[in-house]
A protein has these predicted regions:
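Catalytic binding pocket for nucleotide-activated donors in carbohydrate/polymer assembly enzymes
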Residues: 294-362
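Short hydrophobic signal-anchor/transmembrane segments that target glycosyltransferases
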Residues: 23-27, 210-229
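C-terminal alpha-helical cap of glycosyltransferases
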Residues: 367-387
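Donor nucleotide-activated moiety binding/catalytic core segment of transferases
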Residues: 246-294
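Active-site and donor-binding regions of nucleotide-sugar-utilizing enzymes
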Residues: 8-30, 38-181
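Nucleotide-activated donor-dependent transferases that construct or modify glycoconjugates
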Residues: 1-14, 198-199, 312
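A nucleotide-sugar donor-handling region in carbohydrate enzymes
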Residues: 143-212, 235-239, 353-354
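Structural loop-to-beta junction motif characteristic of Rossmann-like glycosyltransferase folds
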Residues: 121, 287, 303-307
Length: 387
């Protein structure tokens, strides 16, 4: 009897798709596996189809709808919480009940078991970012039947915290890297020969640099003539005006981006296009400027200078949640940015050794593609034939 595996894409943006869609391409090779791709928006389906190519003809796509009432309520409730995503789960229980296994790049879907009673459905979680912040190690992670992990650092910490076991986890690498070579330099996005900085603030309301420093950072770059700037925040930052953190009990208002930066030839502003998710900007820049985004680990596939903004004056030095801040210089104020950029240019290799070691521990890399390793881990864990 075939093993029916569902891949769910249920988010407001497209940044999670590349983390699990490549696995579909490898799973269709298994004779007794049926694949169902469940999407909650036409944009999600279009992106999955684009990424998996010819494999799309060998899977079944199912569009999930949240219902009219939920869509109306989401206009208000969705400003501060993932209301629509939860409504999609609740409104499509028969579709999920028909599956044997559900593969997801997030943890909201565990509500299908914990709140909506689908006790027989088994869950697989693929990391949608390789970072080490505390949010990755929440208790809900222990509810997954199988965790597909990018590398030894996150695996060892999850096992130490009792969130998984060697039997319920597998090191598979990073399927997103099967869609793009992270170490290959991208084409230059400016023609003026200046070094390019990518500013990549997160949306988390307590730790993001955007809410307290962001406009000052943009103003500084707007008024100088030494650097180009790519402003490429986490794609969720500009999806909502209100950002709330249950973990830190903090809520912040995200103001609109001022028009004064538009048209400046040395500044590129992108609040959420496909290029924000396909590593276009990470591959094209010379210096990374950010805070807590896990994209820093994609950045160090090719070691380069990094600067981290710490507006909350976090005591980070001995905190595992901020391990990535050891990969560059940390500054607490925008006034310190010019000197930090000078040091980044004059000592480009200063953090190379730390970055190379972090990459090795964060990503398990073998001759076999990560997506193939992930597909095999799923089939071996839940039962199935050889391809």
């Amino acid at each position: 009897m075939p093993l029916t595996i569902g891949f769910l894409f249920n988010h407001d943006a497209l940044h999670q798709v590349r983390h699990s869609a490549p696995v579909i391409v490898e799973l269709v090779a298994y004779r007794h596996v049926d694949i169902v791709v469940l999407t909650s928006s036409p944009a999600q389906e279009q992106e999955v189809r684009r990424l998996i190519g010819d494999a799309a003809s060998r899977v079944r796509f199912e569009a999930l709808d949240a219902g009219v009432t939920a869509k109306m309520l989401d206009r208000i409730l969705g400003l501060v919480a993932p209301f629509r995503r939860i409504a999609v789960l609740r409104s499509n229980l028969p579709s999920f009940a028909a599956l044997d296994v559900l593969v997801v790049p997030e943890s909201t879907s565990m509500m299908l078991r914990d709140r909506f009673g689908l006790d027989q459905l088994r869950f697989v979680r693929i990391q949608h970012g390789p970072g080490h912040r505390s949010v990755i190690f929440r208790p809900v992670i222990a509810r997954f039947d199988l965790l597909l992990l990018s590398g030894e650092t996150v695996r060892d910490r999850m096992i130490a915290l009792g969130l998984t076991t060697p039997e319920r986890s597998a090191l598979v690498g990073y399927p997103k890297f099967d869609t793009v070579d992270p170490a290959a330099p991208g084409p230059p996005l400016f023609g003026n020969g200046r070094p390019t900085v990518v500013y990549n603030p997160h949306f988390e309301p307590r730790l993001s640099s955007w809410f307290d420093m962001g406009l000052a950072v943009l103003d500084w770059f707007a008024g100088q003539d030494r650097f180009n700037l790519i402003f490429a925040p986490h794609v969720m930052l500009f999806q909502r005006h209100i950002h709330a953190s249950v973990e830190h009990w903090r809520m912040r208002w995200r103001a609109a981006l001022p028009k004064r930066y538009q048209g400046l030839p040395h500044m590129l502003l992108d609040t959420g296009s496909q290029r924000s998710t396909d590593m276009t900007y990470m591959r094209a820049a010379d210096i990374y400027l950010g805070d807590i985004s896990s994209q820093i680990y994609e950045w160090i596939a090719r070691p380069r200078p990094a600067i981290f903004l710490n507006p909350s004056h976090v005591q980070w030095q001995d905190n595992a949640d901020f391990a990535h801040w050891r990969l560059g210089e940390v500054i607490d104020a925008v006034d310190a940015l010019p000197a930090a950029l000078d040091r980044a240019l004059s000592a480009r290799e200063a953090f190379r050794a730390q970055q190379e070691e972090a990459f090795r521990k964060t990503f398990s890399v073998t001759q076999e593609p990560a997506s193939r390793r992930a597909a095999r881990a799923i089939v071996e864990h839940f039962g199935g034939d050889e391809p």
